[in-house]
Amino acid sequence: RGLGDVYKRQDQIGRDVFSRLLYAIRISLLVGILATVISTVIGVVLGLIAGYFGGVADMLLMRFTDMVMSFPYILLVLVAAAIFKPGLWSIILILGFVDWPGVARLVRGNVLSLRETNFVKGNVVAGMPLRHILFSEILPNTVAPILVYATSVMAISMLDEAALSFLGMGVQPPMASLGNMLNGAQSITVLTSQPWLWLPPGIMIVVLVVSINFVGDALRDAFDPSGGRR
């Protein structure tokens, strides 16, 4: 049997490789989506506050954002993963609370320009509630860049989960993830004689990340057609 029969293959302890691969893909997507939602919500809230109010609030929030971004990203993730108990929900929360600074800076930049527009000033003069101005007037006009940026955050989160699980600091066995499936294929014997243990999860990591980046490119072109033309 060749590699094409991966759906019939088993690992060293008799677990079906194809079933575990399908489950691992679901875990990777779950981590990517939930971590992106958490980081996006945090970044949007902080970016709205910093951009709209300015002054001391802007200075404090942006200095805190700069401080978080000044740490090497992968080192920050590794330290957080080492502190907390490894597991699915731990890695989702860690990635969600580490990936928000980019979203916050993006939203703040958009809010700084939008708050000077006539339709926002008109709402302020009309005495509209702050909640309405932020979430009904300003936020909808920042959705497009947020969605585009969120796709890159999702791809990075999935890569980070795979890396941490490979190192034994992410999703723990017996739960399958693409990273810990690769973790079980480190010996030369497995690499050379049992490629069905490591090649399918490796390929799926590449396919998922590239596909999400393609979605991000398509969203960018859809929201800004003129910007995508050469």
Task: Outline where the language-model segments fall.
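Alpha-helical transmembrane segments of integral membrane proteins
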Residues: 10-230
